[in-house]
From Swiss-Prot:
<keyword id="KW-0963">Cytoplasm</keyword>
<comment type="similarity">
    <text>Belongs to the cytokine receptor-like factor 3 family.</text>
</comment>
<protein>
    <recommendedName>
        <fullName>Cytokine receptor-like factor 3</fullName>
    </recommendedName>
</protein>
<comment type="function">
    <text>May play a role in the negative regulation of cell cycle progression.</text>
</comment>
<dbReference type="InterPro" id="IPR036116">
    <property type="entry name" value="FN3_sf"/>
</dbReference>
<dbReference type="InterPro" id="IPR003961">
    <property type="entry name" value="FN3_dom"/>
</dbReference>
<feature type="coiled-coil region">
    <location>
        <begin position="9"/>
        <end position="87"/>
    </location>
</feature>
<keyword id="KW-0175">Coiled coil</keyword>
<dbReference type="GO" id="GO:0005737">
    <property type="term" value="C:cytoplasm"/>
</dbReference>
<feature type="domain" description="Fibronectin type-III">
    <location>
        <begin position="177"/>
        <end position="270"/>
    </location>
</feature>
<dbReference type="InterPro" id="IPR013783">
    <property type="entry name" value="Ig-like_fold"/>
</dbReference>
Length: 436
């Protein structure tokens, strides 16, 4: 009994030790998270202070420059008015000085004439004759003070009050950005970014999403629009990327502060079309297929069976050509050398919107395909049936969506499979399809 009791106590002791170790690890992880939170507050505060100081330094410089330019403009205007109106007065000044000089000369000559030898009428005659010719009764017009400019500066003293009001409302400090990244979901060769508003009072008109590799120094704009999610394509697998989002308020021009940086990666290899099909031309990343004008046509399949249950497979039709009833975009279990995906062990959507399951057309349809249309496939394995000669049967719940409409049905496969191929077939050229 004592041995059993001792063994029980030992077991309890080891369990307590494990619990204490796990508790310690959890606390240490929370301490790391707490330190990250502390650093975010301190670093964002320092960055905000630097941004505020730099903004106001730039603003002061710009305002001082504008005020100096305005002052110089007004001073030049004063100088121009002064010069323009002083010139006539200078001309009048010259006439007056000339008249004074003439009068002085006449005075001297007259005084000499009258103080000369008595009876010398010739000198008196010459003087009076000269005085008559000088028109001593003709005086130049001198403008009165009310007729000449009296310059002054009109300064609107309310301007300072208006500026003060604007300055008091200039800028703001927010403890949190109005929008944050909510979820990052890995997709094959892509990452789905979802964001949401954190401020109910903020009315967002547009959102702006940027991303970069962890090793890059600059962010790139990848989306600007009103949606609250976006799939970022051309993501290299197993490489960390950083994402951030901001918003623009209704009727505003400036963007809000950026959200907290979020890092994510995808471990899923990108979907690719197979090479070597004469009827199709592929992009460099082999995720875009263009039906060319080659006479050969048939189904273009994926490079491998990369579509897994539980994932979302999306086709975006970039350009369209002439429709044909045998056209189709969809998924299949196996690759067959055939003309269309409208066959057994395949599900597809025709360009007219008809849905085919194992070669049979369904009653429900989707809208016809048009430029920019997206067709998404979502599948979920429901049950595994009894085993037959080829293996256990499998039922999948399939949801196909396009243009805000969807078709839901169960797809029964005679044998189970972990992954599916995707494919497309177009009879006529001009169709271009992006897969992701």
């Amino acid at each position: 009994m004592e041995g059993e009791a001792g063994g029980t106590l030992m077991q309890e002791a080891w369990e307590s030790i494990d619990a204490a170790r796990n508790y310690k690890n959890e606390l240490q992880e929370r301490m790391i998270a707490l330190e990250l939170a502390r650093n975010q507050i301190k670093e964002s505060a320092a960055q905000t202070c630097h941004a505020l100081r730099q903004h106001f330094v730039d603003l002061k410089t710009a305002i001082t420059k504008l005020l100096d330019e305005r002052q110089e403009t007004l001073l030049q205007e004063v100088s121009a008015i002064e010069q323009e109106n002083i010139k006539p007065l200078d001309d009048c000044q010259k006439l007056l000085e000339q008249g004074v000089n003439t009068a002085d000369d006449l005075l001297k000559e007259g005084e000499m004439a009258v103080s000369g030898i008595a009876g010398n009428n010739e000198n008196l005659y010459n003087f009076t004759n000269k005085a008559l010719h000088n028109q001593l009764d003709s005086l130049p017009e001198v403008p009165s003070l009310v007729e000449v400019p009296c310059l002054s500066a009109q300064l609107d003293e309310i301007f300072l009050c208006v500026v003060r009001d604007h300055i008091c409302k200039l800028g703001s400090v927010a403890s949190r950005p109005p929008v944050q990244i909510e979820e990052l979901i890995e997709r094959p060769g892509a990452i789905l970014v979802k964001w949401c508003k954190c401020d109910d009072d903020f009315v967002a008109q547009d959102y702006r999403l940027q991303y970069r590799k962890n090793t890059a120094s600059h962010f790139e704009d990848v989306y600007v629009g009103s949606e609250s999610e976006f799939i970022v394509l051309q993501i290299d697998p197993n490489v960390d990327y950083q994402f951030r989002v901001c918003a623009r308020g209704d009727g505003r021009q400036e963007w809000s502060p950026w959200s907290v940086l979020q890092t994510s990666r995808t471990t899923l290899v990108p979907h690719e079309w197979s090479t070597g099909y004469d009827g199709y031309s592929l992009s460099s990343r082999r995720n875009i297929a263009l039906r060319n004008d080659s006479v050969s046509h048939g189904v273009l399949y994926s490079k491998a069976a990369t579509y897994l249950s539980g994932q979302t497979l999306t086709f975006r039709v970039e350009t369209v050509g002439q429709m044909d009833k045998h056209d189709g975009i969809g998924v299949c279990v196996e690759q067959f050398d055939c003309e269309s995906l409208q066959r057994d062990k395949a599900v597809c959507v025709s360009t007219s919107g008809a849905v085919y399951v194992n070669g049979k057309e369904m009653t429900n349809q989707l809208p016809p395909v048009s430029p920019g249309s997206t067709i998404t496939f979502d599948m979920e394995i429901m049950t595994l049936g009894q085993t037959n000669n080829e293996g256990p049967s499998q039922k999948r719940r399939v949801t196909i969506s396009s243009s805000n409409r969807e078709v839901v049905f169960d797809w029964l496969l005679e044998q189970s499979c972990d992954s599916l191929y995707f494919g497309c077939s177009f009879v006529h050229p001009g169709w271009k399809v992006l897969v992701f």
